[in-house]
Amino acid sequence: MLLEIRAAIPEDASVACQVMRRSIAELCVADHRNDEAILKRWLSNKTPEVFGSWIRQPDNSLLVAVEGGKILAVGSVTDAGQITLNYVSPDARFRGVSRALVGALEARAMERGNTRCTLTSTETARRFYLASGYVEDGLPVGNFGTSSGYPMSKLLASHDA
């Protein structure tokens, strides 16, 4: 089947939130260590209501990766080039879905005039981003009670253009 990456719509909210919540709970154990307090904080804004507000933000691009009508991943990038979300369904891990979604997020950032993207990676995704051309941009920072948020950036285009 063909993977389609498109702008999220309000009707995606419920399923997209399930994808994000499963991704965090099942794939990010190295980050939350099954600590209920950390999980509760991390999952607290992964609701259909908050998802709807992300869609409506004028300086934000919220994308979904869809295959056969099923949402497999959710990603977001601000107009300033900051990737704020990149979650893949555990059912779609290691199939190139996250790589395709990050490529679309980077393309959107470039459309907005950015020459680099920034993000804060989880421990779980750190090797993925390094393999995707990102470099670490500082000391780890705490996220949701963890100490495993890694500031990273990637040059997208030449500053000499």
Regions found by a protein language model. Name each.
Residues 7-10, 18-93, 102-104, 108, ...:
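Acetyl-CoA-dependent GNAT
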Residues 96:
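Glycine-rich phosphate-binding loop
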Residues 109-122:
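Conserved GNAT acetyl-CoA-binding A-motif
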Residues 118-120, 135-151:
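Conserved catalytic-core motifs of GNAT/GCN5-like acyltransferases
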Residues 129, 134:
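Conserved active-site tyrosine of GNAT-family acetyltransferases
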